[in-house]
């Protein structure tokens, strides 16, 4: 049996301390946490009303919408994020949000994945601290293993991107992809031929800030990529009584992706467009219904990716 120290992984590192709060059930941050307050607003969740800000939040894994990554980024931007989120199962949505917050904006939310026995011991404690890659609570001190992206075998082009030879945006994207690969226990990457971007609605300013930051850094889309539905009728919102501040921000969000090379499709149903994926074609789609349709009806292959991925 491996020791807890070998199995406790620090995915996003931050020296921080705080009170421990155990979520009795998994939580969807999208629709479940208010990014303006940090409180749980899902009335069906047993911890409804609890504020997660500055706490060491324990939950087995998250659940629900892949847009939860954006909510965590907005919480980090607002200074209302949990101090740390600790999982004992595979988790990608909030993890990706924390990676993006760190990589692009230097807003850290500590993310750990620990074995279940250590998780249970943490749940019995009142406070915890992370310092110099060690987790401390009660009388215990656990050494945390850093995420090691060197375990991912890259081809020469991907290595060059990771080394920063193709610009900052590409380097950040490749490092993020490699981190997510390690989280999934993957040891190599597979090229995809098509993409579909979610996170295009102006649910909060984080979606806009992310897209414009990537464009500012020089990001360019390199495969056929479509865009999900947006928050306004791009051409007619001014005539529909939409408030100018909201309409302008929603338009800027859509325009940022188009400027990076995405097709202005603005649909949740990319499978109804021309040049749809073929059977066995490996693609990278977001938007839950599109992922289900692609895998089950078209026979293509895609994961359900979190927003920003």
Residue map of PLM features:
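N-terminal basic/disordered segments at the start of proteins
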Residues: 2-26, 138-217, 303
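A generic, well-ordered mixed alpha/beta core segment in the N-terminal half of proteins
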Residues: 99-114, 127, 136, 227-308
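Short, compositionally biased low-complexity segments
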Residues: 144-151, 182-188, 220-230, 279-289
């Amino acid at each position: 049996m491996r020791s807890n120290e070998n199995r406790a992984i620090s995915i996003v590192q931050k020296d921080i301390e705080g009170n421990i709060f155990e979520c009795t059930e998994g939580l969807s941050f999208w629709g479940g946490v208010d990014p303006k307050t940090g409180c749980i607003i899902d009335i069906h969740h047993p911890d409804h009303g609890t504020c997660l800000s500055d706490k060491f939040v324990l939950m087995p894994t998250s659940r629900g919408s892949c847009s939860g990554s954006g909510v965590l980024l907005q919480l980090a931007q607002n200074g209302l994020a949990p101090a740390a989120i600790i999982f004992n199962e595979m988790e990608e949505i909030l993890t990706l949000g924390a990676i993006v917050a760190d990589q692009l904006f230097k807003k850290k939310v500590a993310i750990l994945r620990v074995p279940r026995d250590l998780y249970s011991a943490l749940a019995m404690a009142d406070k915890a601290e992370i310092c110099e890659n060690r987790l401390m609570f009660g009388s215990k001190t656990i050494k945390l293993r850093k995420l090691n992206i060197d375990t991912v075998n890259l081809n020469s082009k991907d290595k060059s991107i990771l080394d920063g030879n193709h610009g900052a945006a590409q380097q950040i994207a490749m490092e993020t992809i490699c981190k997510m690969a390690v989280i999934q226990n993957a040891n190599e990457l597979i090229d995809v031929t098509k993409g579909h971007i979610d996170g295009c609605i102006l649910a909060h300013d984080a979606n806009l800030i992310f897209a414009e930051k990537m464009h500012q850094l020089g990001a360019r889309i390199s495969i056929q990529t479509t865009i999900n539905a947006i928050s306004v009728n791009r051409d007619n919102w001014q005539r529909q009584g939409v408030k100018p501040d909201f309409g302008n921000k929603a338009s800027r969000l859509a325009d940022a992706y188009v400027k990076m090379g995405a097709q202005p499709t603005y649909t949740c149903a990319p499978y109804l467009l021309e040049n749809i994926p073929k059977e066995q074609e490996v693609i990278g789609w977001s938007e839950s219904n599109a992922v289900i349709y692609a895998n089950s009806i078209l026979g293509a292959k895609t994961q359900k990716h979190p927003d920003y991925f």
